[in-house]
Amino acid sequence: MSQSRPLYEAVTDLPISHAVCLIVVLTLALFAFIRFRSTPNTPPQLKETVPFITNTIGYLTNAGVFIDRVAETLEATKTNIVKFYVGCMPAYIVTGPKNVQFVLNSPGLLDGNFLQLMLMDKHWGLNREEISKFANDKSGRSKVPAKGLATPDDQRYWLGHDRLYAEYLSNRKFSDALADSFCKLFAERLDKHFDEEWATVQLFDVLKTAMAESAIISLFGSKIIDLNPGFVQCYWDFDDIAGTLVWGLPNFLQRKSVAIKDQLHSMTRKHIDSAWEHFDWEGPDRDSAWEPHFGSRLSRETAKWLREKGFSNHAAAGHTLASLFGLNGNTVPVTVWAMIEIIRDAALFQAVSDEALGAFTTDPTNGTRQIDASKLINLPLMQSLYVEIMRLHVSFNVTRKATEPLVVNGYNIEKGALVQTCSQIAHYEEAVWGAEGHPASEFWAWRHIKYVDEVDDCSGETTRRPQFSMKGRPSSFFPYGGGYVMCPGRHFAKQEILLAIAVLVTKFEFEFVEWTNADGSKSDRPPQDDRRFAGFIAMSPDRDARVRLRRLKSE
């Protein structure tokens, strides 16, 4: 009978490669045992086959399936929080309106800037010195510096950057100018390609070009397109990989994705260099709402601010690249989803068209029709349709990092942990969004409308009128993030989406033909969310719609 030997002797007799592997496995097992020991204040943990590896790979490479697993665990454990690890970093996903509100509105405990610092590295292409300008600014985004810090105004980079959007995008004067420009360009592009004869097209393909080009020119000027043949297609190649480039595998394992990003960056750099060379800062366009080189006032003032703060043209080009993702990544897919629902429901098409027509005005001098964007975005069915499509198809993980130990839902969360809340989970909560006959998982255009009685003062007659009323609370609806870190372009995005829908339903007649695959072949099923985009932005339809359209004779 052979005697058992001490473990260290057995290990030393192994080939060195086997010994190293065994030591690594034993170390991981010990680390896992220590980490995964349950304590009274530890939330349920997401199961995995290989500790620290299985969930990490799933989280980084297949966010859609990963979020499904989280949702299943939350349901099975009847809790509002689940723990897992990304590598050796603890991470938590929390749900429930109160917990979401805490995550969104606790800047002193949960840092939302670190994700933007990652974007500055992965998308903008800033160097370390440039990133450190933002990273070292701990003063926050409010007018009064955080924690009483006496940070000089010229070093308050977060506040300065946010002010650009507040002054030149949220401001009604500039947002209306952008909306008018987009609407005009979009209508022109459609009129150029379609007349009163029937044409058969792929809906997503048409909007990918017409919407994206119109929005890009409105924000960044026409020169960015003129200087870069194939620019729009290059953007959509980047759109496919933008999310995983930030959260996915290391760059050396994503060489193709990095090459796509670099190609788009070289195009935006060519645009920035040309704009600085040819724009006359002392000329009449200095304060204009739009000109062809930089485009909008926002784009021009951003380029100026970046240069004044010591950022390179390479950094400014990266800022443009990142803005393109924010500009088109939500608006085009959301519009496509909305049009898919509208085209396949004749009653909805008629209702949306009738309501949109009420936002048109006629110029008394030349008889041309124009859309009143501010009126359009406040129409009840338009707003309900917009919220419903955003609710169902935007998958965005709001991400924070714990700067101090804290407690969420009675559970301890350690300093340095990632804390996330998923719109994809919150937006499907039946208790929040469900209505009789219309479960939260299904599209219903009228979900966010209530009817109110109005009495006419003269006749005394009572009329029931529709009124927009979002079904859920803000803490249950956050497609653009929330709290002090939100998408600064969300207001223009809403305008763009609803303007595009209004133009399409009032100018054209549509007939649905069939669903198609990416190669144009017939699909045996309707589109579903493309889960590659889960966790990052709006999920595009994974199928296209082949439709026939023609311009209405009244047009």
Predicted regions and their residues:
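Conserved cytochrome P450 K-helix E-x-x-R motif and the immediately C-terminal K′/meander segment
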Residues: 57-72, 363-410, 423-430, 467-468
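N-terminal membrane-proximal hinge/A-helix region immediately C-terminal to the signal-anchor transmembrane segment
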Residues: 2-152, 476
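Cytochrome P450 catalytic-domain "roof"
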Residues: 63-88, 114-224, 228, 242-248, ...
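Cytochrome P450 catalytic core segment centered on helix I
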Residues: 237-309
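Cytochrome P450
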Residues: 7-25, 86-90, 194-215, 229-230, ...
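Cytochrome P450 heme-binding "Cys pocket" and the immediately downstream C-terminal segment
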Residues: 348, 473, 479, 484, ...
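Central I-helix of cytochrome P450 enzymes
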Residues: 299-355, 420, 489, 497
